[in-house]
Curated annotation (Swiss-Prot):
Location in or out of the cell: Cell inner membrane
Pfam families: Na_H_antiport_1
Function recorded in the entry: Na(+)/H(+) antiporter that extrudes sodium in exchange for external protons.
NCBIfam families, alphabetized: NhaA, PRK09560.1, PRK09561.1
GO terms, biological process: regulation of pH
PANTHER family: NA(+)_H(+) ANTIPORTER NHAA, SODIUM ION/PROTON ANTIPORTER NHAA-RELATED
Species this protein is from: Shigella flexneri serotype 5b (strain 8401)
Protein's UniProt name: Na(+)/H(+) antiporter NhaA
Gene: nhaA
Residues passing through the membrane, by range: 12-31, 59-80, 97-116, 123-130, 155-176, 181-200, 205-222, 224-236, 254-272, 287-310, 340-350, 358-380
Amino acid sequence: MKHLHRFFSSDASGGIILIIAAILAMIMANSGATSGWYHDFLETPVQLRVGSLEINKNMLLWINDALMAVFFLLVGLEVKRELMQGSLASLLQAAFPVIAAIGGMIVPALLYLAFNYADPITREGWAIPAATDIAFALGVLALLGSRVPLVLKIFLMALAIIDDLGAIIIIALFYTNDLSMASLGVAAVAIAVLAVLNLCGVRRTGVYILVGVVLWTAVLKSGVHATLAGVIVGFFIPLKEKHGRSPAKRLEHVLHPWVAYLILPLFAFANAGVSLQGVTLDGLTSILPLGIIAGLLIGKPLGISLFCWLALRLKLAHLPEGTTYQQIMVVGILCGIGFTMSIFIASLAFGSVDPELINWAKLGILVGSISSAVIGYSWLRVRLRPSV
């Protein structure tokens, strides 16, 4: 019991559980004895009906769209705190992750196109390496525990949120044909209500969550990635303290253990089970996986580092207080963990053309993401080594 308490008291415990869940999923998905059970679990239908409103999704989509919205709510709360009171409080500091995210999307896409531009079919996957899987990137960072400065974690969060927003916009513009404008209208009204609640000084968290559920449902029905609703709600919940209490900080404290020890491991278990059936190492030499690997492993850190360097040289932004440029470069490597968002974009790009291309894309995504995770973790472990 003592060892268990010590483990859960460690800052690295959440990251360790997430990695174990991901490894377990990979083993189960590729084992003849367990792959059927694993996929049956993910395909289990779960239906929610309130009056004429019906949401009918399988277990995988409920985890990715509903539970992960709670994770993004926590991320939104933490980033807002840093924007208002912490390391991103000045305009020039807040601009830094925005510029970094732009570079982290443009350069990987260009590098992918350098490999695939001549092929009109594989060229459609240009956005695959532009994405970052924020959950796995933070999970790898969490493995380093308390040696990671909080400001570095917040920078990664802010960068990855903007990266995700960029990916959502790319999906909506280039890979989605059936956006529901009526649902987007309902979402806009819900956001307006959240803004009014905030301006009127309403401090009851439950009211924001209730409107947030309406917002989440509208975003889900619109065809846009529903987790966006979590970030939006997080940004509107009041941070300012009154009588020594802050609704945002209180909710952040409540959500943290649920996210670290339940939601993120469940997300990893549901999404890391990529079947490698039909995938061979010989395929690594083809232009599709090579373009993805180059985009994630080289393009991400190169784009983030280059755009950050230009921003500093041109005085368009300042480094977040307490960080170094070298640390930002390593965070850029961790942003090469594209994983679930990259796989999602690959399925949209190639699903209706040639499903076999999705397998080759998965191979590139796995190699690029795992390499980025190992290199980023190892480099940070050396650079953030505690002084003896």
